[in-house]
Each structure stands twice: as structure tokens, then as C-alpha cells.
């Protein structure tokens, strides 16, 4: 069974991802993967380019966003906490766009981020989306500190605001017990099993291949405006790349065994199920190939016919403001009738 990556950052994650969306899709096609996710940091800027590349390469798109989250009072030494929100394949794209728009508009003087207050405000959209609690999530840091009770409290704080939740197990084969290690991924898996929460495996991808590691280091330091130095870079090795299905199966096996499970079958099965629920149709869900115009209510109308009436009244008012002579007004009306007929035949009233 082919693996499907659920968390992938492209170069549209400014000063973080190393690879253009199209190149990531081409790599997924070379691996014979049926689908690929794009989950850039706080932006959907690369989503359309990604979806077009998916169509060209015969790969199904999955789209989400990776966002900072503030649901606890963080110590200054604690790294920025983040979660990943995924659109599902039944209207999820529209809700994802509206949620991100709402977060941007209400960010105040800080950066775009999720808070409990904003989740309450935009729950009409967030409750149609899926949430991944990954190694940078508040829950994950509590697990790393061996506080499973606090981790559960944090999970419950966001439970009602999303359609589904999953614990994201990530191992970059880092030494020790912290995020990125197999030990931490296994602890996350055990936590999910203990509390009947779905668990999925991702590779928290930010590179196409291991050779992109030095580029990732430069981006880390440029993002922080600090000199290039080991203490300023995020990665501890070059494992955060777009791995093949075989490579991900090996990682899943290591995590599962460390968690006391004989095989990674359940972990891989749940990951595949989550991917299948998040598959988007480029045409139906995203609207590729279609024409997108403002809805009637945006321009103060209630229907297509009322938009025609509104447009005619506005342009006729413009005629009388611009022309005084009866002959000029008459000629303008004849021209206006022809042009409005063309606009009506195309359904473009709201554009004008």
C-alpha cells in the first residue's frame, strides 16, 4: 500500500520550506504515491499552483495549513507551538479558506495564530476541518515533559472546535526523548491508544531530499535574522524530506515497536484513512477551470436578476452624470443595452 504524506511544507512557507510545490508533486509521482498534502505555514498562497501540479501529474491534492496556536501561557524558552489543520473532501476547502481569512483579519498586531477565543468565533468553519497535534503542538510538549494529564487537558480544550483530531507521530530518528525522536513518537502513539484518539504518521516534510539540508539551515537563520550557526537551526539531521513509501514503512515499524505494537499496520491504516477523507477534487472542491465572481450579496443584491437591475440603475445614473445632450444620452443608451446584454449572457454582472 502506497504511503500518503499528510504534512508537507513547500517554499511558500516563507524562509522554511526548501522546495516548490510542483517539484514535490513530481517527487510524489516518481514514488507512485496516489496523493500528497500541502500544509504550508499560515498561508494558502501555493495551494492553487500545487493543485494544478497535482492535476498535471495525476496526483490527488490534500490541502491544509500549519498554524501557531496559543491555548496556554508559554514560557519564553518554549519554542513556538504549532498545529496542522486539514480540509476534508466535502466542502472543507471553503471552510479552510474562511477560517484562515478570519484568523488573518483578527490577528491584531501579532502574527496569524489560533486561540480559543478565535476558535469560538469561527467555529462554524473550524468544526468542518481536521486537526493534527504534531511534535510542535502544546500537547506534544506536555508529553515530552511526561505530563500526560496536562496533554489530555489541552486536547480536550480544542476537542469541540474541530470535526476530527489525530495525534501526529513523527520520528526524524533524532537522539534522545524529545520531539523528533522515535521515543517521543512512540510516547505520542501510546497516548493516542490510551485515550482512543486516532494516530497518524507523518514526516513533517520541509525538503525534497536530504541534499536540501544546508538550504533549510540558511532559511532558519534568515527567518530569525541570526548568523548561520548550529544553535540557530531547527533540524538535527536531514530526515525531514519527502520519503518513499518503503522508507516511511520502516519509520512506522520503528515507532510501532517502540510503542509496544508488533506491526505498524494499524498506524499506517489510520494514516491512509485520514488521507482518503482529505482528498480534494481540483474542479469540484477548489474550482480549477471555473470562473469565480463575487456572490450577489457582496454587491448588495439578492439574486442574479436583482444584480442585473442594480447594475443597470448604476450605469444609467452614470450616463446622466456624464452626458447632457439628448443625442449623446440616446446613443449611450443604445450602446449600454448592447453591452449589458453581453454581460447578462455571460453572467458577469457582479464583476462590474
Q: Where are the model-predicted features located?
A:
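Extended substrate/RNA-proximal surfaces in nucleic-acid metabolism proteins
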Residues: 1-35, 41-198, 213-223, 266-269, ...
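Non-catalytic structural connector segments
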Residues: 1-6, 192, 257-352
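Glycine- and acidic
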Residues: 5-11, 32-37, 141, 166-175, ...
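Eukaryotic intrinsically disordered, low-complexity regulatory linkers and tails enriched in Ser/Thr/Pro
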Residues: 161, 247-249
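Acidic/polar loop patches that form or flank catalytic/metal-binding clefts of enzymes
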Residues: 167, 199-201, 281-286
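Short acidic/histidine-rich active-site segments
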Residues: 197-210
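Flexible glycine/proline-rich, aromatic-decorated loop/lid segments
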Residues: 208-244
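Mobile "lid/hinge" segments at catalytic clefts and subdomain interfaces of large enzymes
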Residues: 244-246, 271
Amino acid at each position: 500500500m502506497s504511503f500518503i504524506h499528510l504534512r508537507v511544507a513547500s517554499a511558500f512557507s516563507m524562509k522554511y520550506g526548501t522546495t516548490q510545490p510542483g517539484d514535490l508533486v513530481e517527487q510524489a509521482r516518481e514514488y507512485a504515491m496516489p496523493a500528497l498534502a500541502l500544509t504550508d505555514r499560515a498561508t494558502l498562497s501555493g495551494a492553487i499552483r500545487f493543485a494544478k501540479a497535482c492535476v498535471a501529474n495525476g496526483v490527488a491534492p490534500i490541502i491544509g495549513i500549519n498554524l501557531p496556536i496559543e491555548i496556554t501561557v508559554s514560557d519564553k524558552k518554549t519554542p513556538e507551538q504549532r498545529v496542522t489543520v486539514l480540509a476534508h473532501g466535502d466542502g472543507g476547502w471553503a471552510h479552510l479558506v474562511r477560517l484562515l481569512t478570519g484568523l488573518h483579519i483578527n490577528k491584531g498586531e501579532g502574527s496569524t495564530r489560533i486561540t480559543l477565543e478565535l476558535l469560538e468565533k469561527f467555529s462554524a468553519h473550524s468544526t468542518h476541518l481536521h486537526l493534527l497535534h504534531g511534535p510542535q503542538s502544546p500537547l506534544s510538549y506536555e508529553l515530552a515533559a511526561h505530563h500526560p494529564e496536562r496533554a489530555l487537558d489541552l486536547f480536550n480544550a480544542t476537542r469541540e472546535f474541530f470535526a476530527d483530531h489525530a495525534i501526529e507521530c513523527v520520528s526524524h530518528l533524532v537522539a534522545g526523548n524529545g520531539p523528533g525522536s522515535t521515543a517521543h513518537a512512540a510516547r505520542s502513539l501510546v497516548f493516542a491508544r490510551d485515550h482512543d484518539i486516532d494516530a497518524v504518521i507523518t514526516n513533517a516534510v520541509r525538503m525534497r531530499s536530504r541534499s536540501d539540508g544546508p538550504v533549510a539551515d540558511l532559511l532558519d537563520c534568515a527567518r530569525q535574522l541570526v548568523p548561520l550557526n548550529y544553535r540557530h537551526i531547527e533540524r538535527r539531521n536531514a530526515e525531514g524530506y519527502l520519503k518513499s513509501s518503503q522508507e516511511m514503512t520502516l519509520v512506522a515499524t520503528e515507532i510501532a515497536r517502540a510503542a509496544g505494537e508488533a506491526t505498524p499496520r494499524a498506524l499506517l491504516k489510520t494514516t491512509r484513512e485520514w488521507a482518503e477523507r482529505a482528498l480534494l477534487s481540483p474542479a469540484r472542491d477548489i474550482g480549477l477551470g471555473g470562473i469565480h465572481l463575487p456572490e450577489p450579496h457582496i454587491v448588495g443584491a439578492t439574486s442574479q436578476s436583482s444584480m442585473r437591475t442594480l447594475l443597470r440603475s448604476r450605469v444609467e445614473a452614470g450616463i446622466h452624470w456624464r452626458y447632457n445632450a439628448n443625442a449623446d444620452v440616446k446613443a449611450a443608451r443604445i450602446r449600454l443595452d448592447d453591452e449589458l446584454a453581453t454581460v447578462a449572457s455571460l453572467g458577469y454582472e457582479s464583476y462590474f
